[in-house]
């Protein structure tokens, strides 16, 4: 990307701000936001994704504070990828319609997996240069909003996890 060619050598940071995406409470119209954040962070090598419309019809909340589904999608990244974390190498598209990014910081590893397929996907993850015994999981899907999920046990630096259809884990 142009950023890597021009700005990165100068020590500049790239922040991507949101733009209008036709999205409502329907998970299938929300999934492009998750894919966009993945692309911005992985392909674009951005340092941040900023969503600045909070209470607004296209924002994260209604005027009464009710969270829209898009807030939970963004939250899948924002809650777990904290200041000071860095993106680390991951197979960005390990399966058709599955997008993965990984981050490390504060002695933790965060993997964000987006399954935009209409079917569940059993995905194997292999960790390198990290020792992890288990992961806590959180999912946003058609029926869940950043809901705590099952623990993922790691054996020999590898684990397999089922990613529900149209979900962010």
Where are these regions (language model features)?
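Active-site-proximal beta-strand/loop segments in catalytic clefts of secreted hydrolases
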Residues: 1, 17-21, 51-55, 113-117, ...
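Aromatic/acidic polysaccharide-binding cleft in carbohydrate-active enzymes
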Residues: 11-79, 88-96
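Solvent-exposed beta-hairpin/edge-strand motifs
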Residues: 127-146
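C-terminal beta-strand-rich structural cap/linker in extracellular carbohydrate-active enzymes
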Residues: 150-169
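Carbohydrate-binding surface patches
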Residues: 93-133, 166
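Acidic, glycine-rich loop-and-beta core segments that form the ion-binding/anion-interacting portion
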Residues: 1-9
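Hydrophobic, well-ordered secondary-structure elements that form the walls
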Residues: 40, 74, 111, 137, ...
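Flexible loop/turn segments at secondary-structure boundaries
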Residues: 1-2, 22-26, 56-61, 119-121, ...
């Amino acid at each position: 990307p142009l950023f890597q060619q021009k700005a990165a050598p100068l020590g500049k940071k790239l922040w991507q701000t949101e733009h209008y995406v036709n999205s409502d409470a329907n998970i299938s119209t929300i999934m492009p936001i998750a894919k966009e954040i993945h692309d911005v962070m992985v392909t674009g090598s951005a340092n941040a994704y900023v969503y600045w419309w909070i209470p607004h019809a296209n924002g994260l909340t209604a005027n009464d504070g009710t969270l829209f589904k898009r807030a939970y999608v963004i939250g899948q990244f924002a809650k777990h990828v904290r200041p000071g974390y860095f993106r680390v190498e991951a197979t960005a598209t390990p399966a058709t319609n599955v997008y993965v990014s990984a981050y490390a910081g504060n002695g933790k590893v965060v993997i964000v997996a987006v399954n935009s397929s209409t079917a569940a996907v059993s995905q194997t993850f292999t960790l390198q240069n990290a020792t992890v015994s288990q992961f806590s999981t959180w999912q946003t899907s058609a029926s869940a909003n950043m809901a705590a999920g099952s623990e993922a046990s790691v054996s020999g630096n590898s684990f397999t996890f089922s990613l529900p259809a149209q979900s962010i884990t």
